[in-house]
Amino acid sequence: MVDPLKIFWVLTNSTYLVTKFVRIGIADKNDSPPYFDRFLYETEIDENADLQSTVLTVNAKDHNESTNIRYQITGGNIGNAFAVQNTTGVIYVASPLDYETRPRYELRLEATRNRKNNYTTVVINVRDVNDNPPVFDRQTYRTQITEEDDRNLPKRILQVTATDGDVDRPINIVYFLTGQGIDPDNPANSKFDINRTTGDIFVLKPLDRDQPNGRPQWRFTVFAQDEGGEGLVGYADIQVNLKDINDNAPQFPQGIYFGNVTENGTAGSSVMTMSAVDYDDPNESTNAKLIYSIEKNVIEEETGAPIFEIEPETGLIKTAVCCLDRERTPDYSIQVVAMDGGGLKGTGTASIRVKDLNDMPPQFTKDEWVTEVDETNGTYIPETPILTVTVQDEDETNTFQYKVVPNSGFGADKFAMVRNGDGTGSLKIIQPLDYEDPLQSSGFRFRIQVNDKGDDGPGGSDKYHVAYSWVVVKLRDINDNVPKFDREHIEVSIYEDTKVGTILEQFKATDADQGGHSKVAYKIVRSTNRKRQFAISDRGAVSIQRPLDRETQDRHHIQILAIDDGSPARTATATLTVIVKDVNDNAPTFAQDYKPTLPENVSGKKILEVAAKDPDDRLRGNGGPFTFRLDPLASDEIKAGFKVEYDRRGDNENGVAIISSLRPFDREAQKSYAIPIEIKDNGAPAMTGTSTLTVTIGDVNDNKMQPGSKSVLVYNYQGQSQDTPIGRVYVNDPDDWDVPDKKYYWEVQEHQRFKLDTDTGILTMRAGTRRGRYQLRFKVYDREHGQEDIPANLSVTVRDITAEAVQQAGSMRLSHITDEDFVRTWNPVKNQVEPSKLERFRNKLAELLYTDRDNVDVFSVQLKEGSPYPLTDVHFAARSATQQPYFKAVRLNGVVQMHREEIEKDVGLNITMVNINECLHEGKGKCGSNSCTSKVELGKKPYTVSVNRTALVGVRLDISAQCVCRARNFTHQDHNCRTHLCYNGGRCVETRNGPKCVACPVGYNGPRCQQSTRSFRGNGWAWYPPLQLCQESHLSLEFITRVADGLILYNGPIVPPKPEETVISDFIALELEQGYPRLLIDFGSGTLELRVKTKKTLDDGVWHRLDIFWDTENVRMVVDFCRTALVSEMEDGTPPEFDDNACQARGQIPPFAESLNLNQPLQLGGLYRQHFDQTLYNWQYAFSSKGFDGCIRNVIHNSEHYDLAFPALARNSFPACPQTDEVCLKTEHTARCWEHGNCVASLVQAKCHCQPGWMGPGCNVPTIPTTFKAQSYVKFALSFEPDRFSTQLQLRFRTREQGGELFRVSDQHHREYAILELRRGHLQFRYNLNSMRNEEQLLTLTAIAVNDGQWHVIRISRYGSAALMELDGGESRRYNESFHFTGHQWLTIDKQEGVYAGGKAEYTGIKTFEVQSDFQRSCLDDIRLDGKHLPLPPAMNGTQWGQATMARNLERNCPSNRPCSNVICPDPFDCVDLWNEYECTCSEGRIMSSDTKGCVDRNECLDLPCLNGATCINLEPRLRYRCICPEGYWGENCELVQEGQRLKLSMGALGAIFVCLIIILILALIFVLYSRKRKTTKKKKRSGPEKDVRETVISYEDEGGGEDDMTAFDITPLQIPISAQGGPPDIAACKMPIIYPVMTLLPPGQELNVAYLMEERKQRIDKDNNAPPFDDLRNFTFEGSGSIAESLSSLASGTDDENQDFNYLQNWGPRFNALAAMYVHDKAKASSQLPSDGGGGSGDGPGPGASSSSPLGGGGTGGGSGIPGNVLAVVATGSGAGPGGGGGSSGLMPLPEVDKVVL
């Protein structure tokens, strides 16, 4: 039992409880004292022993063996060094021990029990340990030696001594040094050393005290370590001072010193101070005391006296003579000597420059200056100087002041002189100049003056310092006067039937310029003449051009422009007001849209009164009163059923018609009647018109209902539809207005996916209803007839329709048919059900597309609103097979157009428009002749078409015309990755400036990964989407060919027009004819032909570019940017000449059509259309149908690049340009530039065009960007001659600044320039090509900001006065252009002074400059001028094309300023470095939650990245997403498809193939004969399994079965070839050329059903004929393969299989049932899962059974069972018999169709 008090004592360390504890009990009395075994105990302990360390345990004993003995030390414990535990006798260390203080202790130890005690002696000897480090006698040792003393080395300089406090230990101290002059790694370099035992220190080398290599003092440390270098360490400092000797001569560090002295100064003038340096000790005698003297002075020629003197002590140089003359001697050089106290000398040179005083007069470099200047434009005074004058002055320091001498000549008051920073003077205009003033037209002559005193004060009056010169200013006439009309406002009144061509008025304007001889042209402002009803002649006569209509517009305000022939032209405006008077030219009509209803079964009664209206002017008697009557031509049925009575007094005496019925009507016979009513007005002559009144017969519930059934087809858009009404439950009842009399019920119970309105019978499909077929049953009650429980059945079929199907849908508009008629299946005439027009159209379309009808979806049928007669819009989609991408809309529309007549005939339709386009009919829409885009928007709710027996619930599509040019509309908000399609597998990423396509595959180099090039062979074509309608359009393309004739492009009708339809004859055709470009274009009012007779034909095997421009009136075609134009420019200000006949053609569209309306496929390279007479469309010119042979690239319409990779339909057309690719492969560097560049080739040569950021012949050298800091710039000197007509600039940049100049080129005086700059965060390019006046042109990318910190690539292309801007590929908002050749065309570039990057430096002083438009805190990279790389310091200062002659404040690379370094973002956001800016946002792959407080996974599948019908699966943020591709597609986004290219084989190749086929047939015959012989041999040998161990069936159950020799196994069956070309080696020579896959792409896809997709993929693998194993007999499982058993013989008796659980194989699906049957021990369970219709089999071997349920058919290896035990044999092809011989049939498919079996 543990005593708790003892525990407490231990825990509290309390001796009180222990000493006071008294054990109470009864015991024997013991009064004997305790005793010790010995009288003396002796032990040892180290002096460094730890406190509490046990020294010795001494135990006393008691005669009664008592343990109650207490111990204490009573003597000898000096310093309480030890203590004893009073109960145990353990002596321990209580205080630190020190051997050197007390080496021995003799303790007296007392033991006490019951007040009886005894004593003993304990002797403790303290052992010495090394606990004292050596101690030096001094802390610092100092000594002095003389520098450079090399005598008696090494020399002892002092001795150090250290002692060890451990007195009784061996004295064995070792010394060593560290510090200055000590090199432990290489002792040979040390300056000092020490004797390790004596402490003597030696100097080893002579020491130098003096600078620059010496030192006056050496300090190092000496260490002493006892125990022979193994013990403790002590240290001391050593200081060695060096005594100086005079061993250094004085010297002048700079060698040459520069000073100044003013000319004409007095003698003794201070010039400069020369200071020499002596490194000797200045405190050591006179070693460093210097005395200066002039050793070589200059002598004054006249007197022979020295010119300069020097003060010996200070070195101050003074003039010794007076009056130095700078103009005589501008500088002097003297030699000065400095000598120290020891006589050592040093020499320096003083270069003295005489500073100038203004003591010489100025002089103009010309006596007369002549210049020519434009007259000023009104009161505007230009700031630019018109003349720069220069002055010569022998003085160096001058401050020139210029001025015009007042009253010195005519014009002196109109000009002023100003001083320039470089000392020249400029003449500026200060008052308006007017050429039209006869006095001024002859020019001006006056004097100017200059003085070099800098002011007009007293110095200016000093005639000695003033010079004069004459100035002659010639004045040029400019177009500064606007034309002036004689009459600015004219008003005329005419009747609306005035004949076309009638002249209304004559305008006349004059212009004061050119002496009144300026020509004036006249023009009507188009916005005031929208319908082009008026025209104006060259002489100003305004006439009627098109008929007028007062009812449309009764007053016209026509603005007339008078335009002079100046440059730039000036205009004046006048107004013609045309008042149109009325004539009676309109027939009256109904006053309103009457819709009367007449109940059925009612006798004759009044229906309603009808009034009339007339748009003609009633005040002129051209309106009412009206008269009415029934149209005499009305049918007899109408005449018998209705009457029309005229009431003169009705409608306020205007007259009305009273309509009445004459008999009762039956609605079930006819639902409505159209009554024609003739209305006549009161005009002279009167106008008569016929209006039709539709009377609807109202329904009465007078028929009993019969059971009915109805089928409903629902298209569920992306499976996301909400609750959707799908129509009314149908019963067969002729009445159709009797819904209030009926009640509708479910027959049994309500279906969970549908909801019924019992009052209306409307059935609603609930949200989330999946695709499939639903059979629904209802009952209907009719209270009117008392009918109950009339059955009504409803079949609902739900189909999913994808976004891809809607996007790629074709469309057509049907006339005179309603949406109900299109889907109706009941024929009331034949009184029977028949296929609807929808189904017939669907079948016909499937036939035309060569696809199954199930692959055609007619998913939207809508009745167009607002039409006077029924118009129905139909949208449809189709594909070649399930899981395949949908056909493109262009293909669907084209096929329907091509077969329109056939479809109309077979289906019974009237197709009025294919590819529904609300912009197609010019002038009928809201946009008029403006830009127009037909936009299709997805409605929020489905569109339901419900008729009695059928209903279609389709996708609602709202089509509207928007008056914008789609490509140039930058205001829409839905600019994101969902609308910004990236082609060909490119990946769309969202940026702050909108979506951007990245990771484009190689060869797809368009801005959105478009394929830019396509080739044609002369007999092909390719279809693409039609050209969009824009008010101003620009179409450009490039082509290359060696064939002189061929159709390059055509967009227009592809079928002849129908006789009764409105003909839309618009088309555009571009072709080569005899090597020259020819354009035909027709807006519908006449064909315009443009031809360009180029200097050389364009079939020269070189790429050529054609640009076609058109607006509402004008068309222009430009060839190769007009680089071949003849340009003539003079320096005297003569207007330039520009002859563009060989590069440009212009024309006007015949009136009056104003827009190119197209909705047919755009065809490139040829023509695919029906042959028809082109005169059917009234075309005045015919174009060739011969195909183009060559390549076409970069087809761009209004800055949108066409993707040429996958046309909707094509023939004999291929992506890329194989003809030029062959040229690229001919040279090594062009064949290897694909990784970071593009090979650009013609048919004769190729070169590498490097991607931005790369350079070098093979585009394999990365460029290095440069950071431009504040006040930074680079000035270049070019080593090539820039083209004056063309300028190409490309560079990369990144910035966050609002402004700055990126690059500029200019002439010497910066009057002609081209500047790329940043303004308010947007790029702009401005240029001026006229050195005489400012005619600046400006291009800006206003729709996109570029100061987002991202890298951008800008490309500027200037051709003459035309310019193009392309940012990051240049599409849509990243493109702008000015494509007009007007005025000057040349830009002169100064190669040395005119090329800058980062801003232009203006020097404000000798060493100070200021950078204008400083491009700072930004980066530039890869600057190319005319395609040539310019260097960017500091990484590169020069290339073969130029040098960076000046550069300031630049930094290599483009690092960020680490904005996240001091930012802590709140969880869960991360700080993202956006380059010089940061953002706390979510990590990659995540987006901010709706409450902006957290991050959630970004669903990349919403961007529809998976193409071609692939399924998108959203993954974790790091992995983003994954696409499951349909059959035949691959790639990250399923964008690629393998398409075998057709090979053209020569006769030699065909012969080789024929020979190979013969050899193969012979070998096949030999193989057959050999096989038959071998089979016969096998049958003879097979007498039992014991005969040959190579038999595959053995009696494994026998004792020792399977233990025979198995090494004779025939290995031949195991030699399975991996390709189909197995056989003898000779066959390899007959292999066909390899057909490499071609990457192609089909249209974007949408999500698929994953389960269905996996099933389809498995079926495809089963049917793949091209993948191994191939048709042959193979051993798929052989003995011992993949098993832990060594042979099949061990399977029956072994136990290893018992430990293996293969039951999981049963869960792998039916395709793995055979594998499960092999390994699962429960054979019955496995067999029960196999198909049940497999055939049985029989064989020669003793198989375990005859029946088989294997999907492989009956027959096993040697047995009748399909799967005998654990043995498997597979027959891949043939009759289904296994190797054992048993016959069988497949449970899955007929065996002859099986290509292979996959387990």
Curated annotation (Swiss-Prot):
Single Gene Ontology BP annotation: cell-cell adhesion via plasma-membrane adhesion molecules
Highest rank taxon of the organism: Eukaryota
Membrane keyword on record: yes
Membrane association type: Single-pass type I membrane protein
Disulfide bonds: C977-C988, C982-C997, C1000-C1009, C1191-C1217, C1224-C1239, C1233-C1248, C1250-C1259, C1419-C1454, C1501-C1512, C1506-C1523, C1525-C1534
Main location: membrane
Ranges of biased composition (kind: Gly residues): 1733-1744, 1752-1763, 1775-1786
Domain Cadherin: start-end pairs: 37-136, 137-252, 253-364, 368-485, 486-590, 590-709, 708-812
Gene3D superfamilies: 2.60.120.200, Cadherins, Laminin, TCF3-CBD (Catenin binding domain)
Subcellular location: Cell membrane
Residues covered by the EGF-like domain: 973-1010, 1220-1260, 1497-1535
Swiss-Prot/TrEMBL keywords: Calcium, Cell adhesion, Cell membrane, Disulfide bond, EGF-like domain, Glycoprotein, Membrane, Metal-binding, Repeat, Transmembrane, Transmembrane helix
Annotated region described as Disordered, given as residue ranges: 1726-1799
Glycosylated sites: 13, 64, 86, 118, 195, 260, 264, 283, 377, 601, 793, 910, 948, 969, 1376, 1437
Cellular component annotations (GO), alphabetically ordered: catenin complex; plasma membrane
PROSITE patterns in the cross-refs: CADHERIN_1, CADHERIN_2, EGF_1, EGF_2, EGF_3, LAM_G_DOMAIN
SMART domains, A to Z: CA, EGF, EGF_CA, LamG
Residue intervals of the Laminin G-like domain: 1011-1217, 1263-1454
GO MF annotation list: beta-catenin binding; cadherin binding; calcium ion binding
Transmembrane portions of the chain: 1549-1569
This protein's record includes keyword Ribonucleoprotein: no
Functional note: Cadherins are calcium-dependent cell adhesion proteins. They preferentially interact with themselves in a homophilic manner in connecting cells.
Domain notes: Three calcium ions are usually bound at the interface of each cadherin domain and rigidify the connections, imparting a strong curvature to the full-length ectodomain.
Record-given protein name: Putative neural-cadherin 2
Species the sequence originates in: Drosophila melanogaster
